């Protein structure tokens, strides 16, 4: 019979639903059961799990909702004691409690649930032998408890649980994410305290068991129960390599402030010695950034010298301003070759030291930059080292003048310098450059035309020049261009789907007058890598020291296939070629293209998204006059943004004697197993540049990876490549943590399309 009950009872009875508690009778749902639920109630079960903990029958919580209580028998004494027995059911939307016997003293607020009880919510389920508590103090205690947590699909047990406000104290409790009937790993603690206000828990006398065998013991530990951060030990990283042997580090996380944290990692490398890596991350009103520093003391394979690396990166936006810094330092040229850091810069020849600020206005943009480099390639001569920009100031804008006529403004002033130890004899000094233009773009639905006229002026004030050289040279020239294009489209139906096909021819006529620039210094100019887009540029050089004379007509054709239902570009085809009316007179010292050619190679590319997760990209460059291939690239890839990644590539540059193939993949071969591999092969020299092979096993409670990597490296800087092999191991206890986190960084760098969040 329905019986009203004071609403105050409910918060205490349901306190534990925030702490959550279950096994097969704790709402474990396998795939067959999930399929029987209505579609709106079904939840995804990960491929590697047989099921999840989930209960769709209790609904979602509703604040202030009525409570319905039923029981076979009920009595109310004159003292205000309510007694219920026989199939007692207490229900609210999102919550449900069942028990055999329930008592509530309305005068004191004490209550008891006896002869077994079960509490269910939309977040958890728990079963206990009995429960007692106090509604006014919002506290309760349970004995003989089993529980399940839906968010993490975890389960456990406890001899005793005490609930008060938003805290939970568990005595002699266990925790695991393994499926029912499996105890791959179990964390066991004498006392576990959970504070949901702070988002963290503490455990005393903690034992981690694997297959019921104790693996390690900790007298005390803290751990997160939500996404908030907390200081403590992270799991170690581990690898074994040919050159250094065993490499192990133990990260220690420090949550210093809501906007400041740090990680300190003592490190031991068997063949080299001990060291320390550290990183600090911060957030401020100026943006976000990180500071990192690493040191290896008395490296036994490097004349017992200390070896160091440091880096500062920062990115931020303030109103219309953006700020960026990237400063890197290493103590020696071979640091990145000998010691893996996980940094993407480890393969660079010149390490950046950059600080810049940009202002983005509606019409005008301002750039201020300081830039230098640390070169870590000992084979480079001083003459090959890049210039420093100390500083660079730039102003650009596109003000509207009259009607469709707009002005384009570019002005740049840069002070170029070199290191104090440089003995190349190259000039240094100040360069000012201006390139104002007038342009008028006329456009409608079927095409456009855009004439443009530009003036170029460059002025130098040089510091170190020979006596017979001018210290204030300058350059003035002009250019004009006409860019035009048409848009055609037609409807079509291919493979049962409706598409819109476009045809977009483009003509670009460009004229830049010749001025002798052989006596001018060259601080930062060079030839552009030839590509489809480079054919439609006004200046064929990058930088401002060289203005490339030319009279050229570039012809391009683009065709796209757009899916009418989704608007997705299913296929894009492009082809272009340039034709010269005059030989080019302005060249750089390292010119690649012949300035007397009367036409460029034909270049084309294609990207075909031929299925939801598949794409194919191909690019080719063909010299018509010589009837030979100059460059070709091919890549086909698959990425379902979950567990499968496949890449197959081929790269061919005959002029540079480069012909390489690449295959990489992460493929499931079973519900629990994935194969991981990468192979880069030098077809000309018939040698493997890099091989990586490994496997991953994953179920509800484990993720294990074992990888073997072999790559050719120039360890001595003499140009001779030698093989270096490393074995990587990663283990993660799902919902608890693991070690070997550098494996994720390795896969992100090595396998295009892999992202650790997909796992």
Curated annotation (Swiss-Prot):
Primary location class: membrane
Annotated keywords: Cell outer membrane, Membrane, Signal
UniProt superkingdom: Bacteria
Record's signal peptide: 1-22
Pfam families: LptD
Xref: InterPro entries: LipoPS_assembly_LptD, LptD, LptD_C
Function noted in UniProt: Together with LptE, is involved in the assembly of lipopolysaccharide (LPS) at the surface of the outer membrane.
Annotated PANTHER family: LPS-ASSEMBLY PROTEIN, LPS-ASSEMBLY PROTEIN LPTD
Name of protein: LPS-assembly protein LptD
Phylogenetic placement of the source organism: Bacteria, Pseudomonadati, Pseudomonadota, Gammaproteobacteria, Oceanospirillales
Gene this protein is translated from: lptD
